[in-house]
């Protein structure tokens, strides 16, 4: 039997502090990082995505960061395809891939090698649902989803029309709930020898970090970044512009919301998103939870992660 290849996953809600830990980990074991963030993949969208800066990378190779134009669609199928290609390159160099990011759906698809091609989307039904969303609003589709699959509705925001439509399509096509399908996929055996870490803070601390992060984004020029994208012709119907910290500003630029209200909305939406992320990770199996408050220093946290990786036989210790 072929030996399973090593894979490390470092995830957690937005603003948990994954970036710093991921760099320390990569430098310790000779790892290379693949981003599992559905937004950091886009060019020109740096502030609102809290994209890692080149100087923060500290020489560690990164994949799926700053690779797509905002006009392009990035989805789970493209992610898995690109991530697997990057992993082959990393393995060939004798290094270990580290998946870092908060898009749990992408991580699950890669970790358990889920094939999405078996459920071909029905073009006509999708267009029908898209039309419904235009005529009656996103909330209308979301209410249908809540009736059909309330469990899945808990972890997807009504603004994420693409995922709402996918769940409705899946139900129409198979007669089953997408939440049940996801549970079945989680029971699959992963083709990798993996360690799955979820870094988190207690809720009050996390929410405070989110609020402060949004304030810092505004100081760093988030408003100007969004304005520049709109002036370049990027419209609100694009997948990229539906991201947190971007979609909220369209109402502001249309004169329907004050700047203060917009910033509050970004904070609120981000807090809700973090809550949904944690709900997703709780449903995953073989997860190691890392509560930041239990570690006095970053080094203690890194040492704990390295010990677990060693115990799992993923690597023998530090390489750098």
Task: Give the positions of each predicted feature.
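Phosphate/pyrophosphate-binding catalytic cores of soluble transferases and nucleic-acid-acting enzymes
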Residues: 1-320
């Amino acid at each position: 039997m072929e030996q399973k290849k090593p894979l490390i996953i470092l995830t957690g809600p937005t603003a948990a502090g994954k970036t710093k830990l991921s760099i320390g980990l990569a430098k310790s074991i000779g790892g290379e990082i693949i981003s599992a963030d559905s937004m950091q993949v886009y060019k020109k969208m740096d502030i609102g995505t809290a994209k890692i800066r080149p100087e923060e990378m500290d020489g560690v190779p990164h994949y799926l960061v700053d690779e797509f134009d905002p006009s392009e669609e990035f989805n789970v199928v493209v992610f898995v395809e690109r991530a697997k290609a990057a992993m082959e390159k990393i393995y060939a160099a004798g290094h270990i891939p580290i998946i870092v990011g908060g898009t749990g759906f992408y991580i699950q698809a890669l970790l358990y090698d889920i094939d999405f091609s078996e459920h071909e989307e029905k073009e006509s039904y999708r267009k029908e649902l898209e039309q419904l969303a235009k005529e009656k609003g996103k909330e209308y589709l979301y209410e249908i989803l809540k009736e059909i699959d309330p469990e899945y509705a808990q972890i997807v925001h009504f603004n994420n029309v693409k995922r709402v439509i996918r769940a409705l399509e899946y139900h129409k096509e198979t007669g089953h709930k997408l939440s049940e399908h996801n549970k079945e996929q989680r029971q699959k055996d992963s083709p990798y020898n993996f360690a799955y870490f979820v870094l988190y803070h207690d809720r009050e601390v996390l929410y405070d970090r989110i609020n402060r992060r949004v304030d810092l984004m505004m100081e760093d020029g988030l408003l100007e970044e969004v304005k520049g994208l709109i002036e370049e012709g990027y419209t609100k119907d694009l997948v990229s512009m539906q991201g947190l910290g971007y979609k909220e500003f369209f109402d502001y630029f249309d004169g329907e919301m004050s700047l203060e209200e917009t910033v509050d909305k970004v904070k609120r939406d981000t807090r809700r998103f973090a809550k949904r992320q944690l709900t997703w990770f709780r449903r995953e199996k073989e997860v190691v939870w890392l509560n930041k408050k239990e570690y006095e220093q970053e080094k203690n946290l890194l040492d704990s992660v390295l010990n677990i990786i060693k115990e799992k036989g993923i690597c023998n210790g530090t390489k750098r």
